[in-house]
Regions:
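SAM-dependent methyltransferases
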Residues: 1-2, 23, 49, 144-147
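C-terminal binding/interaction regions
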Residues: 4, 10-11, 89-147
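Glycine-rich phosphate/diphosphate-binding loop of Rossmann-like nucleotide-binding domains
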Residues: 4-24
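A general structural signal for well-ordered alpha-helical segments in protein cores
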Residues: 15, 42, 46, 72, ...
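A short beta-strand-loop structural module common to alpha/beta enzyme folds
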Residues: 28-39
């Protein structure tokens, strides 16, 4: 599986740890930056990662900033993206099982490294349940993009 990563200056250190962790687990990582502490605009990097997922270049995506809020809002503006802001393992599991999210967001100032990696592991390894009730709900959400 190929996973897109994107972050701003507030989360580049955690993004690098997530990238290394995913590579060690056998995933391919496409890093859309940023890669340093210089101030930058999170929409540039979150949108690049989201576009890679929406286009099929990457199967999933993870975006990060200090709180995760800005990058999750940005990713969700890209057609076809369902991005969940996560700060606990149960939500990581449920958003895959019930919502079939294709992106997740983390706040580097909210979750520590160990919890972040546990959330990532849970999210990437949990399949969508495929239950008709959940698919029906996803279809209704995705139909909103046509309004």
């Amino acid at each position: 599986m190929k996973i897109a990563l994107g972050c701003d200056h507030g989360a580049y250190l955690l993004k690098n740890k997530v990238a290394d962790h995913l590579r060690k687990a056998g995933y391919k990582v496409v890093d859309f930056g940023t890669n340093g502490p210089e101030s930058c605009d999170y929409p540039d990097f979150a949108a690049a990662a989201a576009r890679a997922v929406a286009s099929g270049e990457c199967e999933k995506g993870i975006v990060l900033c200090t709180t995760g809020i800005g990058v999750s809002i940005t990713a969700n503006k890209v057609k076809g993206i369902r991005c969940a802001l996560l700060s606990d393992v149960l939500s990581a599991k449920m958003t895959r099982l019930h919502n079939d999210t294709n992106m997740m967001a983390l706040g580097a100032g909210i979750v520590g490294e160990n919890l972040a990696l546990e959330i990532v592991d849970t999210w990437v390894s949990t399949p969508f349940s495929g239950e008709p009730r959940h698919q029906r709900r996803i279809d209704k959400v995705m139909a909103l993009e046509k309004e």
